[in-house]
């Protein structure tokens, strides 16, 4: 006589709940990563000046080569 009969279909009842939470967590993580990437892109577009964009501007360079123009080095100080 069998006193306890295990039903194999009831063991899967709790596993159907897990993928829903995993899917929601995955969607949330993807949204957060997307917002971070978008904010970095917008920061570089609107807030930070990318170097060498204005090639024809008449700004003073960051450094002055002193070997090629030694007479100009004293005038720029």
UniProtKB/Swiss-Prot annotation:
Its main location: host cell. GO terms for cellular component: host cell nuclear membrane; membrane. It is a single-pass membrane protein. The chain crosses the membrane at residues 27-47. Coiled coil: none annotated. It comes from the Viruses. The keyword Protein transport does not apply. Keywords: Early protein, Glycoprotein, Host membrane, Host nucleus, Membrane, Transmembrane, Transmembrane helix. It is found in: Host nucleus membrane. Glycans are attached at residue 7. Belongs to the adenoviridae E3A-1 family. This is Early E3 9.0 kDa glycoprotein. It comes from Human adenovirus B serotype 3 (HAdV-3). The lineage of its organism: Viruses, Varidnaviria, Bamfordvirae, Preplasmiviricota, Tectiliviricetes.
């Amino acid at each position: 006589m069998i006193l306890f009969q295990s039903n194999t279909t009831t063991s899967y009842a709790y596993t159907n709940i897990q993928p829903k939470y995993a899917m929601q967590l995955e969607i949330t993580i993807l949204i957060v990563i997307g917002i971070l990437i978008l904010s970095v892109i917008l920061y570089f577009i609107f807030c930070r000046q990318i170097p060498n964009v204005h090639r024809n501007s008449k700004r003073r360079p960051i450094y002055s080569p002193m070997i090629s123009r030694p007479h100009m080095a004293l005038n720029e100080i």
